[in-house]
């Protein structure tokens, strides 16, 4: 059963910061680390990012930037990365990421997603009402 959880989100290829965060979370003796996606599109190294996440067995979901990279969409965004710059293993890792991960925790079921449920672009703001499950 998972008790203490470390959360990472919107990595955006920041491999140095990701490594630092994973190291800090390891020092905190968390039971699991989860990542809300968006590994792609940033100034750092996407290869080092996906390898670090996989190596640390981080529960990771796909974000909209990961989907955009795989589908070759919105490549006009700042610091966009392209499929040609990602290894076959890296592309396979990104393609394997689910939209939703469910984990049993000491506090009950945790549902991890990038947006809301399977909509990676959905946002929640104060006052927003939703029926997403």
Outline where the language-model segments fall:
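Mobile, glycine- and charge-enriched loop segments
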Residues: 1-12, 31, 103-110, 115-118
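Core catalytic region of metal-dependent phosphoesterases/phosphodiesterases
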Residues: 2-96
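Acidic, His/Gly-enriched loop-helix segments that form or flank divalent-metal centers
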Residues: 80-133
């Amino acid at each position: 059963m998972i008790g203490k959880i470390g959360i990472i989100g919107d990595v955006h290829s920041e491999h140095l910061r990701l490594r630092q965060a994973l190291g800090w979370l390891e020092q905190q003796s968390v039971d699991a680390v989860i990542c809300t996606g968006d590994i792609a599109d940033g100034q750092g190294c996407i290869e080092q990012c996906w390898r670090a996440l996989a190596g640390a067995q981080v529960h990771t979901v796909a974000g909209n930037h990961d989907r955009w990279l795989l589908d070759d969409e919105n490549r006009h965004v700042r610091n966009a990365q392209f499929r040609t710059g990602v290894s076959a293993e890296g592309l396979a890792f990104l393609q394997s990421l689910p939209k939703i991960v469910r984990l049993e925790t000491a506090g009950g079921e945790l549902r991890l997603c990038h947006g809301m449920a399977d909509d990676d672009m959905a946002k929640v703001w104060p006052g927003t009402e939703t029926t997403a499950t």
